[in-house]
């Protein structure tokens, strides 16, 4: 079903189901000892989407060269390490506020070794925030930072809601937009980064991943892969969930607003983690995806 401007979801539907899928991939990475996320698998089981529960429980076996749990684990390990390192590097540099936009089932507020006094803000839909908070409490998990939740749609006035939760616009912050931008309309994407800039003190940091052209989700190479995955029970169709059409190139957008941006391709990110990027049609379709970090001013 195509997106609408005011659509809503939980962790089992629409965009929310992609957060559960990502958590399942983190669970595979953790099982392979590539990252350490002890909460990923329990959260996936709590959501209860059958295909992802079976995936984390090892009940789905490789059916094609493109669907390989080990490959999924490596890919998600690269992405997770990128954002983990980003936040920890910022914290070690004295940045005491972290903002995780579209936090989904992200458990960094519970699993990263944050310095004392760090405040971690999680921004996402109310149903998503409530589910994760209650589930982690039931698991006995305790935050390793001061965790503050902002239950709001990023298409609404999330900046005001963030300030109401105590965000300090006079102190630097570290921001992440992980796996987020394709799910925003062009105007909302630009507004997101304009709001981040307006809220950020000099020395603030930002990390994001960017798909230059969402038409990749309609690419025949990806569609063929999607059909094979559907046969295994994966129902998420990214082509229906992402917003298509031209949009600003975020690096240019941010550079014009005072951010110094450093980017690497998805293949370079794999290489930096000791993995070879795959050489098949699906990998080729996403070869232009980039991972970027930025610093404001200075």
Curated annotation (Swiss-Prot):
UniProt-recorded Gene Ontology molecular function terms: methyltransferase activity
Positions that bind S-adenosyl-L-methionine: 124, 153-154
Coiled coil: none
InterPro entries assigned to the protein according to its UniProt record, in alphabetical order: Ppm1/Ppm2/Tcmp, SAM-dependent_MTases_sf, SAM_mthyl_Trfase_ML2640-like
The keyword Transferase is assigned to this record: yes
GO biological process, one term: methylation
Keywords in alphabetical order: Methyltransferase, S-adenosyl-L-methionine, Transferase
Family as reported in the entry's similarity comment: Belongs to the UPF0677 family.
Function per UniProt: Exhibits S-adenosyl-L-methionine-dependent methyltransferase activity.
The protein, known as: Putative S-adenosyl-L-methionine-dependent methyltransferase MAV_0778
């Amino acid at each position: 079903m195509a997106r609408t401007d005011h659509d809503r979801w939980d962790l089992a539907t629409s965009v929310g189901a992609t957060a559960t899928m990502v958590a399942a991939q983190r669970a595979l990475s953790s099982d392979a000892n590539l990252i350490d996320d002890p909460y990923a698998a329990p959260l996936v089981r709590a959501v209860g989407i059958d295909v992802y529960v079976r995936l984390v429980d090892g009940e789905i076996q490789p059916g094609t060269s493109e669907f390989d749990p080990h490959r999924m684990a490596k890919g998600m390990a690269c992405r997770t390490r990128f954002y983990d390192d980003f936040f920890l590097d910022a914290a070690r540099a004295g940045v005491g506020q972290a903002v995780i936009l579209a936090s989904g089932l992200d458990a960094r507020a519970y699993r990263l070794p944050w310095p004392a006094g760090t405040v971690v803000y999680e921004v996402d839909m109310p149903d998503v925030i409530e589910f994760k908070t209650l589930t982690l409490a039931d698991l006995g998990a305790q935050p390793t930072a001061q965790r503050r939740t902002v239950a709001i749609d990023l298409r609404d006035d999330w900046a005001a809601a963030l300030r109401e939760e105590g965000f300090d616009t006079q102190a630097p912050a570290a921001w992440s937009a992980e796996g987020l931008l394709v799910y925003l309309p062009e105007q909302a994407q630009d507004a997101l980064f304009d709001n981040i800039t307006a809220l950020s003190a000099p020395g603030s940091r930002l990390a994001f991943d960017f798909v230059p052209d969402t038409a990749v989700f309609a690419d025949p190479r990806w569609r063929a892969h999607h059909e094979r995955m559907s046969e295994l029970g994966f129902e998420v169709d990214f082509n229906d969930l992402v917003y298509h059409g031209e949009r600003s190139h975020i690096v240019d957008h941010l550079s014009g607003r005072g951010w110094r941006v450093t980017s690497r391709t998805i293949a370079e990110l794999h290489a930096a983690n000791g993995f070879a990027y795959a050489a098949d049609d699906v990998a080729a379709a996403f070869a232009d995806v980039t991972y970027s970090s930025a610093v404001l001013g200075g």
